[in-house]
C-alpha cells in the first residue's frame, strides 16, 4: 500500500493524467502515514515545459501547484526549498501575483536554472 501511495503522489508531481483524479487520490493518500516523495526542480521544469508546449493546460497550473503545496507528504530538498516554495506559492496565488501564461512559465524555468 505504501508504494501505491508514493506512486499516486509522484504521479501528481509529474502530472501524469487528469488533474482532478490525481488531486483527489493524492489527498486521500496524504491523510495516511507513509513515506514522502520529493519535489525537485527537474520535475517542476518538466511540467512547465509541458505547459509551454501545450501538452498540459497552463490555466490549470495554479490548481496543480496549490495541490502540491498543501500536501504534507511532499518534501523539497533544503537546497531547493526557497525557490520551489516561492514557485508553488506564486503559481497557486495568481490573485496576488500575475496571471499564469507561457511567458511566466518560461521565466520560472530560467529562474530555477539560476537559483
Question: Would you name each region that the model predicts?
Answer:
Residues 1-115:
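Acidic, Ser/Pro/Thr-rich low-complexity regulatory regions
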Amino acid at each position: 500500500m505504501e508504494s501505491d501511495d508514493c506512486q499516486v503522489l509522484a504521479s501528481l508531481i509529474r502530472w501524469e493524467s487528469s488533474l482532478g483524479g490525481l488531486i483527489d487520490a493524492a489527498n486521500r493518500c496524504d491523510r495516511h502515514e507513509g513515506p514522502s516523495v520529493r519535489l525537485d526542480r527537474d520535475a517542476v521544469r518538466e511540467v512547465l515545459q509541458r505547459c509551454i508546449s501545450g501538452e498540459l493546460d497552463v490555466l490549470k497550473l495554479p490548481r496543480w501547484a496549490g495541490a502540491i503545496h498543501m500536501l504534507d507528504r511532499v518534501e523539497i530538498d533544503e537546497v531547493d526549498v526557497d525557490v520551489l516554495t516561492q514557485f508553488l506559492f506564486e503559481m497557486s496565488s495568481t490573485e496576488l501575483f500575475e496571471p499564469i501564461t507561457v511567458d511566466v512559465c518560461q521565466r520560472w524555468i530560467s529562474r530555477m536554472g539560476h537559483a
